[in-house]
């Protein structure tokens, strides 16, 4: 497979997000879903909607999210809608909680390592294309949160998230934690789920990753560590595997004093196994060329 192109700028402004999307040379057709992370109630690190507004406006997109599979402000639709208001997403954009009403859509996983099916909020079927906006950071379970997590856990319904976390055992969030899969099985299930979304929107999906507020914890954490590294910049690609690999490499190759703390989180969770599995599933390559913009 030829190398994928990943664009990079150290500029960190709302306008730079638009520039990095435009760099990809793709016009997303039809009705555009924009996948964001709405940020758990109490989290201080999530990227605010004002930062994303120019690029979401540029694609005339609808902000999409799905309910979570654990306690908090986002595991049920009424609470999630209130959270979207509190965090001002609803003030600026059309919002779609894709699994607000059932039934979920079920997309088959081709040659899945763990899963045979992925459960997603049914409204995902209403969109022609997708812009995936990624706040790259650490994650307490996945090691890191990047493009592959946005495609998998991010687009899965509450039941689908449970299914991924349990390696295909159960879909009921109330019995998730006693059914958690082994770590590598969970990571492989994430890659399986990510592959269904990447393939569904093939040729009509773009990824922009923002390396800012680099905490070892995800935006899904109500209580999260403060950022441990300086901000890095913005990356974009049409390849989610290359993009995640490039983000990890930028952390690993930096001389930032917080690098080792961040990478300990990634490595202790075997985080890059998700990237390896996604590459094996054929949705991208870890061979990339970083083009500075």
Regions found by a protein language model. Give the residues of each.
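Extended, low-polarity segments enriched in aliphatic/aromatic residues
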Residues: 2-53, 58, 62-293
């Amino acid at each position: 497979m030829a190398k994928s192109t990943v664009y990079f700028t150290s500029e960190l402004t709302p306008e730079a997000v638009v520039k990095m999307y435009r760099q990809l040379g793709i016009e997303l057709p039809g009705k555009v879903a924009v996948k964001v992370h709405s940020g758990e109630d109490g989290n201080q690190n999530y990227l605010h909607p004002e930062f994303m507004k120019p690029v979401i406006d540029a694609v005339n997109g609808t902000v999409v999210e799905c309910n979570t599979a654990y306690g908090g402000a986002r595991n049920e639709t009424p609470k999630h809608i209130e959270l979207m208001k509190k965090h001002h997403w609803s003030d600026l954009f059309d919002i779609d909680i894709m699994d607000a009403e059932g039934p979920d859509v079920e997309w088959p996983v081709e040659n899945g390592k763990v899963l045979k099916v992925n459960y997603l909020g049914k409204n995902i079927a209403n969109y022609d294309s997708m812009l995936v906006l990624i706040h790259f950071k650490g994650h307490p379970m996945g090691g890191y949160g990047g493009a592959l997590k946005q495609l998998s856990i991010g687009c899965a319904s509450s039941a689908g998230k449970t299914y991924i976390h349990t390696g295909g055992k159960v879909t009921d969030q109330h019995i998730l934690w006693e059914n958690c899969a082994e770590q590598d099985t969970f990571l492989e299930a994430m890659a399986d789920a990510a592959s269904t979304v990447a393939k569904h929107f093939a040729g009509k999906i773009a990824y922009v990753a923002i390396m800012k507020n680099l905490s070892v914890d995800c935006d899904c954490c109500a209580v999260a560590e403060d950022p441990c590294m300086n901000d890095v910049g913005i990356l974009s690609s049409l390849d989610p595997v290359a993009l995640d690999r490039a983000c990890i490499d930028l952390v690993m190759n930096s001389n930032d004093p917080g690098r080792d703390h961040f990478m300990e989180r990634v490595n202790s969770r075997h985080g890059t196994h998700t990237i390896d599995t996604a590459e094996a599933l054929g949705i991208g390559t870890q061979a990339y060329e970083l083009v500075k913009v």
